[in-house]
Amino acid sequence: PIVREMPEIFRPERVVIRRRDGLRAELHAGFPTYRTSWQRVRKALTGLDVRDGAPLIDEVPRGEAEAPVLELYLPTALQVRQWAELLQWRTASLRNGSILVDRVIVTLGERAAVYLSGPPGFNLFVADLPEAERTALATHVERLDPGLFRPYRELILDDLAVTAEPGVVVPDVAELPAAQVDVSMPDLWEEEVRYFPDVTLVRQIDEQDARSLTDGRRVLRVTGAGLLQYRTAEGSGEAAAPTLEQALETAGRWVGSRGGWPQDVVLHRYVREAGVGRLAFEVHTGVRYPVQSLPGAIQVHVSAADRVVYFERSPTVVNVSFEGEPLPLISPEAALAHALPAAPVLAAEPVRSMYLTYLLKPPAEAGARWTAEPTWVIQAGHTEV
């Protein structure tokens, strides 16, 4: 669904729940159980009294053997102080507030606690979890459908020039069903009135693989694959790029008035350079299986003058069905070996996580269908491969 207001772009891409028996459930954005689980976890994390935390620690405790553990894989790395503001943590003086973190770990044993983790190898203790919140989360985990929990295994890296952080495991699965994707393609003439204040000045430019409209100051382009691109000549000169908060406020209003946001979008990256703040978003969806876009499925560039100077949007995913024949999967070790030559970070940084998803890909030729293929996603350091 498309929504006018910017959705909850900082919610976790996935929530991993490790049960007492060692089995794991991996809940991705779009899953019905994800929504209820995230609501409960967010309630437990909101308003924590972190005092003068968060101190650095050597490693995050893996939790007691008989107690569940929750891991929240956040969509982007933000500073500790930014997550503290988003979750309304109570603190008089936050230590290590500038460290980048992208993961929250909640242990639910006798000493239930909240931790943060981020590349390259930073781990922080946040606070003890109050007993009421610990009980509520533990009860929620106990009541989850047992069918959500699957076996996982450790990576076998003996013959690879790759290392992994302690505790990294992968789903023990050999095949997944083929997927079929339906997307909503943009109509250039319907989009025209959203991007040009005076349509009488607009003329069309035909390209081999795209169609464009321009009024001399702005260009709106739709490619054969359905990618919509908007650019304006307005720049920001030598002024400083906007802060993340300023860029999000401007982007939220601008995109909301020009067709709206996919409901399942999350923030993937924010870069400030040359007087422009560049926001890149991903789409994470799916019901039976996780489905996600390539990074930058939506891009919004905001100038220092709080104007959107570039916008890019992939077609909206309407439906993904999984009725095809089972597809054999390559092993995670084979995926690492395949990725290593093109991603030297895998040899320099330990693997922090590895998971399976259906990756949305544009067609190779105009008029062909978008596809969603089972793909191993590898995270090492700040990089996803």
What are these regions (language model features)?
Residues 1-245:
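Preferential activation on post-signal-peptide N-terminal prodomains/segments
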Residues 34, 41-45, 49, 53, ...:
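Short, non-transmembrane alpha-helical segments in secretory-pathway proteins
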Residues 98, 106, 273, 292, ...:
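A generic structural signal for short, solvent-exposed coil/turn residues
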Residues 124-128, 290-292, 318-326:
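A short, polar/proline- and glycine-enriched secondary-structure boundary/capping micro-motif
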Residues 187-232, 261-307, 314, 354-384:
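Exposed beta-strand-loop-beta-strand "reactive/processing" segments of non-cytosolic proteins
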Residues 303-333:
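Short helix-loop boundary/capping segments
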